[in-house]
Amino acid sequence: MVTWKDAPTRTVDVDGIRFAYRELGCGSDVPVVFLHHLTAVLDDWDPKVIDGIAAHHRVIAFDNRGVGATGSSVPRTVEQMGTDAIAFIRALGLEKVDLFGFSLGGGVAQMVALQAPDLVRRMILAGTGPRGGGGIDQMTKIVGVAYAKAFISRKDPREFLFFPRTPEGKHAASDYLARLHERTRDRDKKFSLQARLAQLKAIVHAGKSDPDDLSVITAPVFVANGDRDLMVDSDHSADMARRLPNARLKIYPNSGHGGVFQHHETFLADALRFLANEGA
């Protein structure tokens, strides 16, 4: 079976814009569409997670507008990112999907569910929270501090943003970043500074927005986070889970924003049970 490191990059026309995506996994009636995080391109998905899901489901991951190999520019709002995601999904001829949104992607997934509820069967929202509050409007400062630490120490910013600076967290960060480089051919275009700034503005705008009425999202949702998330506090994730009428919550111990990657084996078991409607 094709794995993430070998999956070919394809494109599809979405209202005149070429969207880059990759697809793999076994055939299933409802594919799982992956929505990625701040400053991420296709190559930034953890192969352990994406291959683990693809062993049981058809998986589709894509670069949203203005990101990586996809054309145009990054939208000004997370809401518009959701609109673009809907357009991409429909351009593939899909009528029903499961969504896996990590971080910013979790916010985009919520917008998809709010704008096109009939399109979404189930959602996994990891390392994310709802619009409005939760310190999300401070994201520029949080990211800036991490980038400064990374520059001084010559490390990847995700070592500071995604994982706690404990021996266990540092080891998990090293393993995670190594996995991201398993793919050596047909790699995506690098994330541009312009796109990074645009995404940060959209996230800050979401943090300052009025809260959404999440009670209208009736699809089953699995909310996951680490107990030491610096970017989206686990309490904010828990608040989101409480406001979703059909949600379950799991907080992974001794982990941060990337808790689902640090605890990828446990998370995969939880996610697959959830997608199979067996609980999580």
Where are these regions (language model features)?
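Gly/Ala-rich beta-loop-alpha elbow adjacent to hydrolase catalytic centers
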Residues: 101-105, 109
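Catalytic active-site module of serine/aspartate enzymes centered on a nucleophile-bearing elbow/loop
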Residues: 247-280
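Conserved HGGG/HGGXW glycine-rich cap/lid loop of the alpha/beta-hydrolase fold
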Residues: 15-71
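Active-site loop/oxyanion-hole signature of alpha/beta-hydrolase fold enzymes
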Residues: 60-100, 269
